[in-house]
């Protein structure tokens, strides 16, 4: 079974942990408890293929910056999360993406831009069009999500698996060859 390393990145309080825990455990975490680093594993089926996702839920971008390069180096795919209720979290994404590209030393990195908390429409300050435009500029996918309302949560991770499969196709293996292959995704 192919493994995928996904890293979730973004500013503090945007809902990185809420998205990850909702996807992995089906639970919405109400209480904000800043993350240092948590790792989750979940087996899923994407397009008829069994996949093992290793998801690294990271600290907010303003914390533990020394560890971030290591996450980026090891990740195969990245979820860049902002809150639609906080403009500053959206503004942080450009630097975050630039750092990923610098560490990976390539412009072609599986990545999805995620506007979280779309259930809080009354508190929206970042328009959906802004997210779509930035994703277009990045050449990445874009989704608005709500961990609380379970909107587009699984789709984020499935889309990233598909991107990783396109970017790093599994070479045909003869019987008896090792089945171990690892791919990484980072969610910011």
Swiss-Prot record:
Locate the residues binding GTP: 10-17, 57-61, 116-119
The organism's superkingdom is given as Eukaryota
- Give any single GO term for biological process: cellular response to cAMP
Q: Which reaction does it catalyse?
A: GTP + H2O = GDP + phosphate + H(+)
Effector region: where is this motif? 32-40
Q: CDD domains in the record, alphabetically?
A: Rap1
Q: Does the keyword Hydrolase apply?
A: yes
Which Enzyme Commission numbers does its entry carry?
A: 3.6.5.2
Q: What is the deletion mutant like?
A: Worms are viable and fertile but display molting defect. Longitudinal ridges termed alae, which are cuticular structures secreted by lateral hypodermal seam cells, are poorly distinct or interrupted. Died as a 'bag of worms' after degeneration of the proximal gonad, or alternatively, as a result of a burst vulva.
Question: Which terms in the GO cellular component ontology are assigned?
Answer: plasma membrane
Q: Which PROSITE patterns match?
A: RAS
Which Gene Ontology MF annotations are present?
G protein activity; GDP binding; GTP binding; GTPase activity
Cross-referenced InterPro entries = P-loop_NTPase (IPR027417), Rap1 (IPR038851), Small_GTP-bd (IPR005225), Small_GTPase (IPR001806), Small_GTPase_Ras-type (IPR020849)
Keywords per UniProt: GTP-binding, Hydrolase, Nucleotide-binding
Q: What does this protein do?
A: Required in the hypodermis for proper formation of the cuticle.
The record, for NCBIfam families, names:
small_GTP
Family membership? Belongs to the small GTPase superfamily. Ras family.
Protein's name according to its UniProt entry:
Ras-related protein Rap-1
Q: Which organism is it from?
A: Caenorhabditis elegans
Q: What is the lineage of its organism?
A: Eukaryota, Metazoa, Ecdysozoa, Nematoda, Chromadorea
